[in-house]
Amino acid sequence: MENDKGQLVELYVPRKCSATNRIIKAKDHASVQISIAKVDEDGRAIAGENITYALSGYVRGRGEADDSLNRLAQQDGLLKNVWSYSR
């Protein structure tokens, strides 16, 4: 919802699970949001540049969070030499 100035005024903005594209509900207390910083050649974090993944409690409860995070990071080019059964 927006006010007359066009500013967002809602208290809750729903997120989607990065692995399943399901909406993460407000009462899903098992969900996590993980931010991975991009780094320069010296290994220092670049300010303001990061990649964020949201994982729902459903994915974490099934024990698929680590595989999902590896798959998402491979798609974004963060991991290159991780074993995958699909290769």
From Swiss-Prot:
One of its GO terms (biological process) is translation. Coiled coil: none annotated. PANTHER family: 40S RIBOSOMAL PROTEIN S21. The lineage of its organism: Eukaryota, Fungi, Dikarya, Ascomycota, Saccharomycotina. It comes from Candida albicans (Yeast). It is found in: Cytoplasm. Required for the processing of the 20S rRNA-precursor to mature 18S rRNA in a late step of the maturation of 40S ribosomal subunits. Has a physiological role leading to 18S rRNA stability. One of its GO terms (cellular component) is ribosome. This is Small ribosomal subunit protein eS21. The gene is RPS21. The keyword Transit peptide does not apply. Component of the small ribosomal subunit. Mature ribosomes consist of a small (40S) and a large (60S) subunit. The 40S subunit contains about 33 different proteins and 1 molecule of RNA (18S). The 60S subunit contains about 49 different proteins and 3 molecules of RNA (25S, 5.8S and 5S).
